[in-house]
Amino acid sequence: MDDIVIRGGTIIDGTGKAAFSGDVAIADGRITAVGGKQGPARREIDATGLMVTPGWVDVHTHYDGQAMWDPLLAPSCWHGVTTAMFGNCGVGFAPVKKHHRQALMDLMEGVEEIPNPVLAAGLTWEWETFPDFMDALERRERVIDIAAQAAHLPMRVYVMGDRAIRREKATADDIAQMRQITAEALRVGAFGFTTSRTDSHKTPDGELVPSRDADDLELLGIGSALSEVGAGTFGMNSDFDDEDYELRWMRKQARETGRPVWFLLTDRFEDPERWRRLMKAVHAARADGLSLTAQIAGRPIGVMMGIGTALNPFTVRPTYKALESLPIAEQRRRLLDPELRRKILAEKPDAAEVAKLSQFRQLVTTRWDKFFTMDDPPDYEPGPERSVAAIAARTNHTPDEIAYDYIVEENQYLFFPVVNYVTGDHEVIREMLGDPACLLGLSDGGAHCTSIVDSGLPSFMLAHWGRDRRRGPRLPLEHLVKRQTSETADFFGLSDRGRLVPGMRADVNLIDFDRLRLHKPELVHDMPAGGRRFVQRADGYEATIAAGIPIFERGEHTGAMPGRLVRAGHNGHR
């Protein structure tokens, strides 16, 4: 007898085939039958009117630290994610020598905006090597499965010490050691290696990260570990200032290792055609038999701004900045004072404070046409009429008056799309989502605690692209499900999941598609040391099943902890 039979749902099995009705049977953590009418089971779940999909496989998170203190891995678990991969963007916490722990926390804070006090309180540091780190992850109970990649920054600091932090060139011996560490990581189950080559990744002091200037000899030398072991992918984030150089070494990496190479791709205001040039290069590489892939986001990556967030238009005004150390409720109480409002609105941005900001953050003080109000549920494809500049023009107010009152009086968050919104709509994203050379990722779960929360991306993909979009064509649900199940699983070699077919791991979502909606992001204080972060919930998930065990029912955790560390090269994963 089966353990569970899900009866009469609309099955979208993750393969891309058309939806069909039927049952899904589960026994011993595996799917035993899909479709038709199945026999009795110890538990039967009525899925009439529900969509039945594989659990989401999210391959771009930053739960490297949170996986040590949070068995849920929220918010991802609230959105049907059953497998989360971290170690992205070259940042992580292993390997590490004791005297470099602070440096790695600084790098994680600078790159992914996870505060130092949170990391200091939450990390146990019961490891030095990457195998030690994997063992520490494996010892913990958790709700969903996790998978790790080896990150460049910690291994560069481990091998080179302060020379890495000063971004000195790696010697041949340095490269050999990093290659050995990477091979060791792959053998104990890392799914690949990642690095960062972007100026947007800096330490809290504004210094570029240790891997920023690594040359092709270093990258190719480390990458050769992938061909030695015969496993893993090579991932990279770059500004592509020298496109020819970057593409040349990526092609060489793919050719010499025979392993998949991927990079992060978005459109950018400063170079709207860059993404097209890069995709042309990807297709050319593929035509030459090379495995080169662009990892993309399914919506604009944008910063939310309000009271208590990492940034808002008034954080560079002296009077406002003086209040930032106060509790959020007290900040708002004072900001509601009409006299204080007049004083802040009359102030000019502090030039010294502005100079400390990145180029993007400087835009936040001036580009009122790029600020948008958010609804509940939030609208991630707002039209130009929703911008602060447009509202100000219609109502005969100044833009900063509109922004101040929205943030303070209405206690709301403004949305500033950083990338993927050059055209003011989602048409570029739609083109990317239709390109088989693109892989869906970039949810960034666990990162950018007080500025971004994109971990609800799986729910957004279905609700927005499959049902709610009004400013352009929608996409088929079968395509959207495949994009975040079998495609992501297959790319990284997670060969036992991502499809509802017999023999596969029984990771399943039951979704009331008509009710599926994202909530407005919420700022909460639930991290170690009282740290705050944005979270975002969703309605519509009737149940999420992991390894054949219900872990969430109607949005509530059942108490079950079937999650584990998935190791590449073990149990058939490669």
State each model region's role:
Residues 401-407, 476-485, 500:
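Short, well-structured alpha-helical segments that form the helix of a local strand-helix-strand
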Residues 1-5, 11-55, 521:
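Histidine-rich, glycine-flanked metal-binding segment
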Residues 133-137, 143, 149-159, 166-174, ...:
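Active-site neighborhoods of metal-dependent hydrolases
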Residues 431-438, 443, 455-457, 510-562:
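C-terminal cap of metal-dependent C-N hydrolases
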Residues 69-192:
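Divalent-metal coordination cores built from histidine and acidic residues
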Residues 12-23, 415-423, 429, 476-479, ...:
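Acidic, glycine-enriched loop/beta-strand segments at the rims
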Residues 9, 29, 49, 60, ...:
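Divalent metal-coordination and catalytic microenvironments
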